[in-house]
């Protein structure tokens, strides 16, 4: 119980620190990230696909499968899935690979972005050539996250995007997130607290952003 309580405290501390230090669209000096924030991350307009997929969520009673830290994380499941959908759709990927995802609703949102979604460890064999979007759900260890990163790194191209859910899950994951940010092929990262975005854009200065959502 003491360990659980400490983990809970650390998570809340990280959340509050992120809220204090993160910027809005107006605090970014990158045209790419400003547009992403303004037109995608902060696009809160209702969409017909939301109605369909939230009906699916109710049918599956999927909230029990959402990986998170307490009520605050569970209450964000709907908003986070819709954010993932918007980012994926804006990115226009042809091939998406998803790993460590326990949520059927998240899979449905990814599939709705008009991509060919592959699941699980067989995905690398099934997807030939490059991977446009890699979605990694809630990894339990930093070693597993880094294993996925380095396994798929040869498949990433300049237009690829890696989405990592739960980048503040524990100290291991936070350390792995820092290692990913420092990698020479990574040019832009966007820390949305609940999820991290990793870009490999060529010709762009290395920058890291924390955006408030």
Protein language model features and the residues they cover:
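A short alpha-helical cap/connector motif
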Residues: 1-135, 139-161, 167-213
């Amino acid at each position: 119980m003491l360990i659980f309580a400490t983990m809970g405290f650390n998570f809340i501390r990280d959340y509050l620190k992120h809220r204090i230090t993160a910027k809005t669209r107006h605090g970014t000096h990158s045209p790419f990230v400003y547009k992403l924030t303004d037109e995608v991350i902060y696009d809160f307009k209702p969409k017909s696909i939301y109605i369909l997929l939230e009906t699916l969520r109710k049918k599956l009673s999927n909230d029990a499968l959402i990986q998170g830290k307490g009520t605050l994380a569970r209450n964000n499941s709907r908003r986070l899935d819709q954010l993932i959908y918007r980012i994926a759709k804006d990115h226009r990927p042809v091939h998406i690979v998803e790993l460590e995802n326990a949520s059927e609703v998240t899979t449905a949102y990814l599939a709705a972005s008009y991509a060919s979604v592959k699941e699980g460890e067989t995905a690398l064999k099934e997807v030939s050539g490059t991977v446009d979007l890699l979605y990694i759900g809630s990894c339990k260890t930093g070693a597993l996250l880094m294993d996925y990163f380095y396994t798929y790194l040869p498949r990433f191209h300049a237009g690829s995007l890696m989405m990592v859910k739960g980048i503040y899950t524990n100290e291991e994951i936070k350390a792995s997130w820092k290692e990913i940010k420092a990698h020479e092929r990574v040019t832009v990262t966007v820390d949305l607290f609940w999820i991290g975005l990793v870009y490999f854009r060529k010709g762009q200065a290395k920058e890291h952003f924390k955006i408030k959502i």
